[in-house]
Swiss-Prot record:
<feature type="binding site">
    <location>
        <position position="113"/>
    </location>
    <ligand>
        <name>5-phospho-alpha-D-ribose 1-diphosphate</name>
    </ligand>
</feature>
<keyword id="KW-0460">Magnesium</keyword>
<protein>
    <recommendedName>
        <fullName>Orotate phosphoribosyltransferase</fullName>
        <ecNumber>2.4.2.10</ecNumber>
    </recommendedName>
</protein>
<dbReference type="GO" id="GO:0044205">
    <property type="term" value="P:'de novo' UMP biosynthetic process"/>
</dbReference>
<feature type="binding site" description="in other chain">
    <location>
        <position position="108"/>
    </location>
    <ligand>
        <name>5-phospho-alpha-D-ribose 1-diphosphate</name>
    </ligand>
</feature>
<comment type="similarity">
    <text>Belongs to the purine/pyrimidine phosphoribosyltransferase family. PyrE subfamily.</text>
</comment>
<dbReference type="GO" id="GO:0000287">
    <property type="term" value="F:magnesium ion binding"/>
</dbReference>
<keyword id="KW-0328">Glycosyltransferase</keyword>
<feature type="binding site">
    <location>
        <position position="107"/>
    </location>
    <ligand>
        <name>5-phospho-alpha-D-ribose 1-diphosphate</name>
    </ligand>
</feature>
<dbReference type="InterPro" id="IPR023031">
    <property type="entry name" value="OPRT"/>
</dbReference>
<feature type="binding site">
    <location>
        <position position="137"/>
    </location>
    <ligand>
        <name>orotate</name>
    </ligand>
</feature>
<dbReference type="InterPro" id="IPR004467">
    <property type="entry name" value="Or_phspho_trans_dom"/>
</dbReference>
<comment type="pathway">
    <text>Pyrimidine metabolism; UMP biosynthesis via de novo pathway; UMP from orotate: step 1/2.</text>
</comment>
<feature type="binding site" description="in other chain">
    <location>
        <begin position="133"/>
        <end position="141"/>
    </location>
    <ligand>
        <name>5-phospho-alpha-D-ribose 1-diphosphate</name>
    </ligand>
</feature>
<dbReference type="Pfam" id="PF00156">
    <property type="entry name" value="Pribosyltran"/>
</dbReference>
<feature type="binding site">
    <location>
        <position position="111"/>
    </location>
    <ligand>
        <name>5-phospho-alpha-D-ribose 1-diphosphate</name>
    </ligand>
</feature>
<comment type="subunit">
    <text>Homodimer.</text>
</comment>
């Protein structure tokens, strides 16, 4: 279980950003933007799934996740930890272990045979569920799992993402209006700060990334992507 040693939030954010660069989980490509599932064009891309392949790094990140939840939500606020199919599942298992809690996972859709279950594992009626994802942009994907948990009788008031895009100022407020507080460890601003500190890219690339973070939809539209996001 977790040792309850709390590292300062800013230090955790910087360390996670450095870890992501170290394992080459983040990429900047301003001259040939990535196309995200939302249809946005983006000069940045992240693959948090790579974390599971680096034991020392994943252990530190999960310690930070536990510290974030205990500090911001409390010690006795949850009965179950839930991960979404598929990226959230290993992180849910590791966080549940640290918090000393049961774990469930949520399918993207009912499996269509047998019990036709969408939630796997034991979730008692009224259980207070903490949902974890590897990353979230505006919370939309997380809410697919939250809605399924609520429909099955669980209570969800908190979610945590190891990495939060933090490019839409209204996103956390939108989640709050739907009854969920979003917690996170690191953001693109932290990653960009480390890239500048270590001079990982030329100024032109770094400035383009910053322009995207300042006005993501305008940057997307200018570079061949959508200029507005579909409603959840």
């Amino acid at each position: 279980m977790f040792s309850n040693a709390f590292t300062e939030k800013a230090v955790m954010a910087e360390l996670v950003a450095k870890m992501l660069w170290e394992i080459k989980a983040v990429h900047f490509r301003a001259d040939e933007p990535y196309k995200l599932s939302s249809g946005m064009a983006s000069p940045v891309y992240i693959d948090c799934r790579k974390l599971i392949s680096y034991p020392r790094i994943r252990s530190a990140v999960m310690d930070f996740a536990a510290a974030t939840i205990l500090r911001e939500a409390g010690f006795e606020q949850f009965d179950v930890v839930a991960g979404g199919e598929t990226a959230g599942i290993p992180f849910a298992a590791m966080l549940a272990e640290r918090l000393g809690l049961p774990m469930i996972y949520v399918r993207k859709a009912p499996k269509g045979h047998g019990r036709n279950a969408q939630i796997e594992g034991n979730m008692p009626e009224g259980a207070r569920v903490l949902v974890i994802e590897d990353l979230t942009t505006a919370g939309g994907s997380m809410f697919k799992f939250i809605d399924a948990i609520r429909a099955a009788g669980g209570m969800v008031e908190h979610g945590i993402a190891l990495f939060y895009y933090d490019i839409f100022p209204e996103a956390r407020g939108d989640m709050k209006s739907k009854g969920v507080d979003l917690h996170f460890i690191a953001t693109w601003r932290n990653v960009l700060s480390v890239a500048r500190e270590l001079a990982l890219f030329d100024d032109k690339t770094l400035n383009e990334v910053e322009a995207f973070l300042d006005a993501p939809l305008a940057w997307s539209a200018k570079n061949g992507g959508v200029g507005a996001l579909a409603d959840r």
